[in-house]
Curated annotation (Swiss-Prot):
Record-linked Pfam families: Sec1
Keyword field: Cytoplasm, Endoplasmic reticulum, ER-Golgi transport, Golgi apparatus, Membrane, Protein transport, Transport
Name of the gene this protein is made from: scfd1
UniProt keyword Glycoprotein present: no
Keyword Membrane on entry: yes
Name of the featured protein: Sec1 family domain-containing protein 1 homolog
GO cellular component: endoplasmic reticulum membrane; Golgi cisterna membrane; Golgi membrane
Amino acid sequence: MNQNSSLSSSGMMGSGGFGFDQFSNNFSIKTKQIESINKMLSLKSESSSSNNNNNNNKAISGWQEVWKVLIFDTHCSNIIAPILTKGALRNQGVTLYLPLHSDRQPIQDVPAIYFVLPTSDNIKRIAEDCKNKLYDNIYLNFASKLSNQLMEELATLTIQSDSVSMISKVYDQFLNFISLENDLFVLNNPRDSYLSFNDTRIKDTQAQENIDMVVDSLFSVLVTLGVVPIIRAPKNSAAEMIALALEKRISTTLQSSGGSNVFSNMNEMGSQLSSFYRPVLILLDRNVDLSVCLHHPWTYQALVHDVLNMSLNQVRIDVTQNGQTSKKSYGLDSSSDSFWSSNTGAAFSSVAGEIKSQINEYYQQMEKLQQITDIKLDDSDDFDNNNKKSNENKTKGLGNLVQEMDEKKRLIDIHTNLATDLTKNIRDRQIDCFFAMEESIITRSLTDKKELHSLITSPIVGETGGRGTLEDKIRLLIIYFLSTKNVPQSEMDQYEDALTKMGADLSTLDFFKKTKAFNESLTAIANVNQSSTQSSNTASGKIGGFMQMMTSVTGYQGVESFTNFFQQGVRALLPKSKDLFVTRIVESIMDLKNTLDADYLYLDPKIQNKSNVPKRTTPFKEAIVFTVGGGNYVEYQNLQDFSKKHNKKIIYGSNELLTSKEFLNQIKNLNKN
């Protein structure tokens, strides 16, 4: 068996002039991962290789048009699902895809591509497949590096069954992460990441495993992007341990024979350019800003995630049509859904107005299409009886228009249903009021404590005068507590008594009380954007007006009923422009403001002499920001707003993207310990 280190992609830069824009356009984690997986599926890497172990002696060139079987484990299924559709797999010649640990029948004369995590259980099952000769031959692709121990185990098992010849090639693909957007990724590891990195009772061996998993996945991200970054991380933190381990792994790889090729995904000139435009990898502990994990969001993507529980770009909601309610699942993909791509970071009130515009545009286009169709049907002169090809082209053109309109209606239906469900939740829970109050607290512009008191102490949803769920109230109280320097004890007692009478579990609040005393970073949260002078009452009033407008909405009745959904000027209902704490840290590091040098490591994996690492003198144009212990869409969107404003490229990643409910549950479990 031959084991190769798979390159993340082939040359991506043209033969013309080179510049930052061309390099920066390739700074897309999703695009790069798709390229790598497509290359794996097409078997293009085999085109110039001979295979000593393949007794079938089949020509590899052109195999991308031949039927192939894709075998994957659950881990790698999660990697593929958000980025490749069934149609995309068919385009690569994959007509059958099956779980590794399932009962599978032999398929003769067909090659099988395995995409799995390197584990002992997977190795044993692969060896069993080889023994049973399920396929013509096998191409093994591991999501992360196959250890020598597992390689030896595979060799031993296949030698014992005389089936070594079944395996054509073995590849380390370095794809052990999940891309959700071009600038967003998460790790493919077990959940409860905040709990894992903050539980003081965890064993040393488990703590090291947690660090190793993050290092392995971040290494995959860097290999896929084809970059060796400068690494920055706060000292005395889990992020520091990950940074040091990652630097060591990169340095060791670069020093090994052929190691530099692992990070090379460009031609010679492109490699020189990527060396000049090196990004910075910023590792941050989740504890640097805890309150952002509890924010009530107001942008579209963040709301869909937090309220509708979107996971891996999939969301499942109740949809009512013709009096019948059923569950529907939607895949939200920015590359194929133009509305989603354009509105993920927009305020929900703006999205609602955009849906109305799309519906109006749809009806206008349908009217025009109907007129064209009527003319074509009525005017026989439009068709040339002597020119069959011309007539076919005209008919095909009409067919394409109809398909385009069907797709447009499908997207309108999806986002109408999502907006309707969000609207119901916003109205019932008064999410707009909680959002406005949190904005005023964080920007230190709170002037109406009566509204704060009402939101926390009023009955819960479902009761007379109800405002929000218990979770909504606890989130608001914690944000107020964390973001306010001195909250009178009598005031806290009043809020806690009210919540306790409603049946609230305040163990999460107890945790934050303990944390606030010694976590210095929380102090900075109270000072976010002190210069903001915009009144919170204005924002609250506008958003409240938005909700009054929506009270007549009772449910989805189809596209037609939605045209009257929004009749008022909702585009003015935008959140205040502000940089969150993580964004300000990123800005400081990227612009070399030197305000964090004493507290943050500066690591360069390319430098052998670690005691004398030269510092960068020009600002960074690209960054990979990774939060250890969980991230969220509020933070992600804030970074993207910053990057667009300052012409930078920022990729955001974390162990997982947490809803506020998930984060609170982890805090609750942590506090039990």
